[in-house]
From Swiss-Prot:
Protein name (Swiss-Prot/TrEMBL): Putative membrane protein insertion efficiency factor
Coiled coil: none
Listed PANTHER family: MEMBRANE PROTEIN INSERTION EFFICIENCY FACTOR-RELATED (PTHR33383:SF1)
Annotated Pfam families: YidD (PF01809)
Cellular component GO terms, alphabetical: plasma membrane
Length: 73
């Protein structure tokens, strides 16, 4: 993971360690949105990874889809 992607991943890591354990799992997709975001940052870097993660989170709502949604290659 490049330095920019690492910096962007810090809030996601904070969410996963501190906030996520306090709330029920609400993600409609597999893998979870935070796992998807981390994988997208690792695979695609800061710019495209952030774009993919933002698109995914925007789809994760009660009227959105559900199921398996892996990070594209």
């Amino acid at each position: 993971m490049n330095p920019a992607a690492f910096l962007i991943s810090l809030p996601i890591r904070f969410y996963r360690l501190v906030i996520s354990p306090m709330i029920a799992s609400n993600c409609r997709y597999t893998p979870t949105c935070s796992s998807y975001a981390m994988e997208a940052l690792r695979k695609h870097g800061a710019i495209k990874g952030t774009w993919l993660a933002a698109r995914r989170v925007s789809r994760c709502h009660p009227w959105g889809g559900s199921g398996i949604d892996n990070v594209p290659d």
